[in-house]
């Protein structure tokens, strides 16, 4: 049990598959801690609302829309490369914060059409509020009193949470209001915008952000309320930078420690992107061809899964692997342990991208690899995330050789809401 409450920790792929496919499970109480900030956005909602909103948001990740997002990813990656120049001096560089600010700028512009410019101005009120709000949720998650939600209202953290939520929500509502004015300055403009959307559909030439999509859809014949839109925008800001930051940083770290694998990735970049890889605008088609880089990223996500554990709760009696599971039991699906199971991945601590060749992948059972969760509630933005990770890494490796850091700065991990470094992710950068 955990905190004197019944729970089952699972790392067996067969059992995980049965849990993820069951109709009598929902997310655990942990996700309730996010509702003051995220409301009932996609990561928290259940039932018909989740089904409807998932259907509404899915078109935002059609490959035609992803091609438009690549314009943003390319630009912000170029800003990152420029910022790193001052750190390419032979000493250890903590790339984690740099990548965090880059990822925030990418998701803000993709989701809201807002240029946060976090890479230039990392101490904005909104960015700091997002960071602190995440910390409060984390502390509640590991509190001995986490099941007693009523007690939280009497704490200093609750008062601070209310202040932070106001900052974050006010920012989002202002963005929604400003975007509405841009799209619908008057009735004639509204008709013109709707006609253009109808002609181009969701997949047309017009760059469609998540916010634009939400402003132009209807549910049961009615537009979404500002509150519903804000919930989904906040959800994407919350989920859209942490995991990509870790994936990019951890991949860079592993490459810095294996010169032969790094050289093979670099050779692939030169062969497919071309000799101008340092500055060329990366396209969807080009990134899809970088198969070895994708294998490297997948191996990083195996060793360092962004979300090392996910929770589910049984809402009715169920049978798992022949055993009756009572209503109210919490399942903790241990993705980190699953990904480091020596029966699935021999010598699991060894970094080996060949595990994700087509031949090797098909031999593993279902649910043996799930860095983006699995089942119907898997990560809706996983293709977006993979494109972003590839884009940043191509730019990084085209411009810099990565060398290992000093022993004192070797990677140490901790489990927050995602898997994070204790003191940062350090590499040495050498300009190519």
Residue ranges and their predicted role:
Residues 259-261, 382-420:
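Cytochrome P450 heme-binding "Cys pocket" and the immediately downstream C-terminal segment
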Residues 16-36, 52, 345-346, 359, ...:
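Cytochrome P450 catalytic domain signature, combining two hallmark sequence patches
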Residues 333-361:
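Conserved cytochrome P450 K-helix/beta-meander segment immediately N-terminal to the heme-binding cysteine loop
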Residues 62, 164-248, 278-286, 290, ...:
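Conserved cytochrome P450 catalytic core segment spanning the I/J/K helices
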Residues 59, 234, 239, 359-389, ...:
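Cytochrome P450 heme-thiolate "Cys pocket" and heme-binding signature region
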Residues 61-69, 93-94, 159-160, 201-203, ...:
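Conserved, non-catalytic sequence blocks in retroelement Pol enzymes and Pol-derived host proteins
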Residues 5-6, 13, 31-112, 124-181, ...:
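Cytochrome P450 catalytic-domain helical core, especially the substrate-recognition surface
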Residues 103, 107, 112, 164-172, ...:
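Central I-helix of cytochrome P450 enzymes
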